[in-house]
């Protein structure tokens, strides 16, 4: 057998490759020491070396049958969780995950040693430590569909935080499509017909779901819709698009972009929302009394993290395993009325 095959490697095969008994492999995997257990260091190192070479990861269900329940939940983020630009996305999620783990009496293990390839962390690598956790929560705007498919094929207990297209991967997500269509529909009912959508440059499901919501609301109408990729790094180009296209409504996927454009519009003498309405398809958890009250989506990310933990706990349970419908669920996304949307006072400001 090749030591680099991608299918699941069994403990029996590990034992054959290392020239030891299957019981020895089990003892090494579970770090059993003390008492009458005596495994020479050379033997232990040989078993660990084969484990690394074959990319072996223990089946969590087998670990539970063997009485190994660490009460540890792993957390893997495809993007760094703590840089300032990521805080608004990850902080409420991690708060919810922490609260859920506390309710269950479990500890959290954040996987940080994974390699970065093409700007993205890789879940599978030669020093994979997934076996240290009973189950794993996956976080990220974009996830590798090949890795998700492999997790499913190899029977890992995982839950993705956010909707995923990959078949059979359990997830708890937010229904961005319905909420986006609803809030944009409100704007159209007020009379907006020239709409500019500033969207993120990402193929993540949540990004595509918001875009689909915009399309659902504006299709089969007389709305003139323009869209532009924007992460807020080129405010001048964003503003130039506004002055050229002359929309009465700007939809900004990023709350930071919405804030920057609001400030620029006010500086240029625009009355928001009379001259220019702005909708944000997200919310910042860092709110102060002086902040603009945007008409916006308010994703329940703390609840999302907590619900994902609960689903993972049920996947690990022998008594409360979720039904097929419960394995992939979407939470409704609240809409904040705010103060940046009103009927246009004219077709468009030149």
Show which residues each predicted segment covers.
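N-terminal helix-turn-helix DNA-binding module of bacterial transcription factors
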Residues: 1-68
């Amino acid at each position: 057998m090749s030591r680099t095959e991608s299918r699941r490697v069994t403990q029996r095969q590990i034992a054959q490759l290392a020239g030891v008994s299957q019981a020895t492999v089990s003892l090494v995997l579970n770090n059993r020491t003390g008492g009458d257990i005596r495994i020479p260091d050379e033997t232990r190192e040989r078993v660990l070396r084969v484990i690394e070479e074959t990319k072996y990861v223990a089946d969590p269900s087998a670990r539970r049958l063997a009485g190994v329940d660490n009460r540890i939940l792993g957390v893997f983020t495809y993007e760094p969780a703590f840089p300032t630009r990521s805080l608004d996305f990850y902080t409420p999620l991690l708060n919810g995950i922490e609260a859920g783990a506390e309710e269950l009496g479990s500890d959290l293990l954040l996987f940080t040693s994974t390699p970065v390839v093409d700007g993205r962390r890789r879940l599978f690598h030669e020093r994979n430590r997934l076996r240290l956790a009973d189950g794993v929560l996956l976080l990220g705007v974009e996830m590798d569909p090949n890795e998700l498919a492999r997790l499913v094929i190899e029977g890992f207990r995982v839950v993705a935080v956010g909707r995923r297209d990959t078949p059979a991967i359990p997830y708890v997500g937010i229904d961005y499509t319905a909420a986006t269509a609803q809030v944009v529909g409100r704007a159209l009912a007020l009379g907006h017909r020239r709409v500019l959508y500033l969207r993120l440059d990402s193929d993540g499901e949540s990004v595509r779901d918001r875009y689909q919501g915009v399309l659902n609301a504006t299709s089969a109408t007389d709305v003139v819709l323009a869209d532009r990729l924007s992460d807020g790094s080129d405010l001048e180009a964003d503003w130039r698009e506004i002055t050229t296209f002359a929309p009465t409504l700007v939809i900004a996927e990023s709350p930071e972009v919405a804030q920057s454009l609001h400030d620029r519009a006010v500086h240029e003498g625009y009355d928001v929302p009379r001259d220019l309405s702005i909708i944000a398809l997200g919310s910042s958890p860092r709110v102060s009394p002086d902040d603009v009250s945007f008409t916006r989506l308010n994703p329940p990310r703390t609840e999302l993290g907590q619900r994902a933990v609960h689903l993972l706990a049920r996947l690990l349970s022998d008594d409360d395993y979720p039904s097929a419908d419960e394995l992939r669920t979407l939470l409704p996304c609240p809409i904040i009325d705010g103060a940046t949307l009103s009927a246009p006072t004219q077709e468009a400001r030149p």
